[in-house]
A protein has these predicted regions:
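N-terminal, post-signal-peptide region of Sec/Tat-exported proteins
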Residues: 51-78, 82-84
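Sec-dependent signal peptide recognition
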Residues: 2-9
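A structural "domain/chain start" motif
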Residues: 4, 14-60, 161-169
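Surface-exposed short loop/turn segments
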Residues: 66, 76-142
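Extracytoplasmic/periplasmic, Sec-exported soluble proteins
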Residues: 43, 47, 51, 98-100, ...
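C-terminal/domain-edge helix-coil "capping" segments
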Residues: 112, 131-169
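Short coil/turn motifs at beta-sheet boundaries
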Residues: 27-31, 72, 95-101
C-alpha cells in the first residue's frame, strides 16, 4: 500500500510540474526526417563510416527519428572530422605507455530552415594497452568509434537544450 501511494504521489508531482524528457525537445527541433552526412577523411575513411552509422543509430534509437534523403528531410546534420589524437595517460615502471586517451574532435552543423547551429565537440575515450605494445588498428578504430559516440551523445544533448530554449520563446 505504501509503495503504491508513494508511486502515485511521485507521478502526480512529475505530471503537475510539466516535466518532459529532454529528448522531446530535440525531437521537436530535429523534425521527423533527418538527412545526415559525414565528411570522409582521406587519411581515415573507416572512421567516417563508423560515425555515420553511429549517428544514424543514435537518431533512430534515442530520438526515434528516420534518416532520409536530403530533398525529403526536415533537417540536416553534417559531421566533419577535425582532429584525432592519442594521448598517453599512464606509464609503467619501465616507461612504456599502458593507458591512452583518444581525443576525437568533430565539427557538427545542424540546419533546419533558418536555424543553423555549429558546434565543435571533443569526444574522449580511455583505453589500456599491454606494456611495450603499439596501438593496434582494431584498438585504434574501437577508441575512435567510442569517442565519436560520446561526441554524438553530447551533440544530441546540445540539440535538446537548444530545442528547450526555442520552445520557451
Amino acid at each position: 500500500m505504501k509503495k503504491s501511494s508513494l508511486l502515485f504521489i511521485l507521478l502526480i508531482i512529475f505530471l503537475s510540474c510539466g516535466y518532459k524528457p529532454s529528448a522531446q525537445y530535440a525531437k521537436k527541433l530535429v523534425g521527423e526526417k533527418v538527412y545526415t552526412e559525414v565528411d570522409v577523411s582521406l587519411s581515415d575513411p573507416e572512421n567516417a563510416v563508423l560515425t555515420k552509422d553511429a549517428l544514424n543509430m543514435a537518431l533512430q534509437t534515442r530520438l526515434k527519428r528516420r534518416v532520409s534523403k536530403s530533398k525529403n528531410a526536415d533537417s540536416s546534420i553534417f559531421v566533419l572530422y577535425k582532429d584525432i589524437r592519442f594521448i598517453p595517460l599512464q606509464y609503467d615502471r619501465n616507461g612504456y605507455v599502458v593507458f591512452y586517451q583518444a581525443h576525437i574532435t568533430l565539427d557538427f552543423t545542424f540546419k533546419k530552415e533558418k536555424i543553423v547551429e555549429k558546434r565543435k565537440i571533443v569526444g574522449r575515450f580511455e583505453f589500456p594497452i599491454r606494456p611495450s605494445a603499439i596501438i593496434s588498428n582494431d584498438l585504434r578504430l574501437k577508441a575512435i568509434e567510442k569517442g565519436s559516440l560520446k561526441a554524438l551523445d553530447e551533440f544530441i544533448s546540445y540539440l535538446s537544450v537548444k530545442g528547450l530554449l526555442l520552445d520557451e520563446q
